[in-house]
């Protein structure tokens, strides 16, 4: 059988290694971008045929093509593959076809899915279980096939799920849904359907945990598994209390709104698995939040700085803003074809001053007539401007609302740059 790998990012690289280890000899790699010399040397050494700087019809000779999650479904090469009757799949589906599905936990949502997956992994590990954490976050799922685990905790994205034919997981968590990735998906409905797909492949013995506040959820009567909603009258988080099925538990700290939702969703599933809320809360005490997600950096001249570089959509920015009264907000990056009029209308009461740079300014500009704002050229200038327009006691929030790729390799590099600038200014001010 001839296997094609369309795109050679992290997931397909991991899949290639697994295929080679298991004796699959006829593999063809097709990458739209230029491959680095080390990668080409490795492929030649392994006897793998490849092409770079474009995807050609050579892929049509493959029996199955595993698509990197970032490949858009309406790209020319995908259209040709579909027209040619080539079976299209993805690395996540490859894993699910071979793993013990009773052990797989899938977590998705527009915001909070990485942190929730990490929290679920931490809570299970705290219980003494051997747990794999990966998927869209961190390690590709296929890596887990080399060992046996008690549980596989996977963050799954809409891109991955779109390409999956039958993504069944025994436990599935849907955190939230809002407009996102409309530069990739053809419509919000397609995005929503991708996010929901695992629920429709679950069996009656499985569990589906979901946010009751998602207004766009369709009728779930066709969903077979046990359905457990959160944000209900008896299952919610309020201030520093977790309430599960009417029973109240004190949280071990104060958390931003999105983190509260993450805690709520994970606690619901954990309680369903073990009936041990106290055990979950005990694990929460030692959980370290992921960087670049409402990360408090410290203070300079009495101003509080927050790094929320992971916020790549306006929905995520609104979530960050909800933690404060009025802030100095820094936005940048590439917009995702969202409704920016509605965003500004909802965000305006919480914005003292907006500082913006990058491509997203074009999206925001028509709606800024009643918002005090400044246009800058880069993050360094944005930081200086934020100090200039703020006063002691203000919050300076870096929550970009757009993808990073216009100026940075990824959101993490962008967040690291913001942190570096903060540390430099803090040192210059002589503050500890």
Curated annotation (Swiss-Prot):
Its main location: cytoplasm. It catalyses: UDP-N-acetyl-alpha-D-muramoyl-L-alanine + D-glutamate + ATP = UDP-N-acetyl-alpha-D-muramoyl-L-alanyl-D-glutamate + ADP + phosphate + H(+). GO terms for biological process: cell division; cell wall organization; peptidoglycan biosynthetic process; regulation of cell shape. One of its GO terms (cellular component) is cytoplasm. GO terms for molecular function: ATP binding; UDP-N-acetylmuramoylalanine-D-glutamate ligase activity. Keywords: ATP-binding, Cell cycle, Cell division, Cell shape, Cell wall biogenesis/degradation, Cytoplasm, Ligase, Nucleotide-binding, Peptidoglycan synthesis. InterPro entries: Mur-like_cat_sf, Mur_ligase_C, Mur_ligase_C_dom_sf, Mur_ligase_cen, MurD. The gene is murD. Cell wall formation. Catalyzes the addition of glutamate to the nucleotide precursor UDP-N-acetylmuramoyl-L-alanine (UMA). It is an enzyme of class 6 (ligase). It comes from the Bacteria. It comes from Thermotoga neapolitana (strain ATCC 49049 / DSM 4359 / NBRC 107923 / NS-E). PANTHER family: UDP-N-ACETYLMURAMOYLALANINE--D-GLUTAMATE LIGASE. Pfam families: Mur_ligase_C (PF02875), Mur_ligase_M (PF08245), MurD_N (PF21377). ATP binds at residues 109-115. This is UDP-N-acetylmuramoylalanine--D-glutamate ligase.
């Amino acid at each position: 059988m001839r296997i094609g790998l369309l795109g050679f990012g992290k997931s397909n690289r991991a899949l290639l290694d697994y295929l080679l280890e298991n004796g699959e000899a006829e593999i063809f790699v097709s990458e739209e971008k230029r491959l680095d010399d080390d990668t080409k040397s490795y492929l030649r050494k392994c006897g793998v045929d490849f092409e770079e700087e474009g995807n050609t019809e050579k892929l049509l000779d493959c029996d199955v093509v595993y698509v990197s999650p970032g490949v858009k479904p309406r790209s020319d090469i995908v259209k040709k593959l579909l027209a040619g009757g080539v079976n299209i799949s993805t690395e996540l589906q490859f894993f699910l076809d071979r793993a013990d599905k009773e052990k797989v936990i899938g977590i998705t949502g527009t915001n909070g899915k990485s942190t929730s997956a990490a929290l679920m992994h931490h809570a299970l590990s705290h219980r003494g279980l051997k747990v794999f954490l990966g998927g869209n976050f961190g390690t590709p799922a296929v890596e887990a096939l080399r060992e046996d685990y008690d549980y596989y905790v996977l963050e799954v994205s809409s891109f991955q799920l779109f390409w999956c034919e039958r993504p069944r997981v025994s436990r599935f968590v849907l955190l939230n849904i809002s407009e996102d990735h409309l530069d990739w998906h053809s419509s919000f409905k397609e995005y929503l359907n991708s996010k929901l797909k695992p629920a429709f492949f679950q069996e009656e013995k499985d569990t589906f945990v979901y946010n009751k506040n998602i207004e766009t959820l369709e009728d779930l009567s066709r969903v077979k598994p046990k359905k457990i909603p959160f944000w209900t009258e008896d299952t919610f988080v309020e201030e520093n209390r977790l309430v599960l099925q009417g029973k109240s538990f004190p949280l071990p700290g104060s958390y931003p709104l999105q983190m509260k939702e993450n805690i709520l969703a994970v606690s619901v599933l954990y309680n369903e698995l073990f009936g041990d809320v106290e055990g979950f809360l005990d694990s929460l005490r030692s959980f370290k939040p992921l960087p670049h997600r409402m990360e408090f950096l410290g203070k300079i001249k009495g101003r509080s700085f927050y790094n929320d570089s992971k916020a790549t959509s306006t929905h995520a920015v609104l979530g960050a803003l909800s933690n404060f009264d009025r802030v100095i907000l820094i936005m940048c990056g590439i917009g995702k074809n969202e409704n920016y009029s509605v965003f500004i209308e909802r965000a305006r009461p919480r914005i003292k001053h907006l500082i913006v740079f990058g491509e997203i300014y074009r999206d925001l500009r028509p709606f800024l007539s009643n918002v005090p704002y400044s246009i800058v050229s880069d993050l360094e200038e944005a930081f200086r401007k934020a100090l200039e327009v703020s006063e002691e006691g203000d919050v300076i929030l870096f929550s970009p609302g757009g993808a990073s790729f216009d100026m940075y390799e990824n959101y993490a590099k962008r967040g690291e740059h913001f942190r570096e600038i903060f540390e430099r200014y803090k040192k210059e001010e002589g503050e500890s």
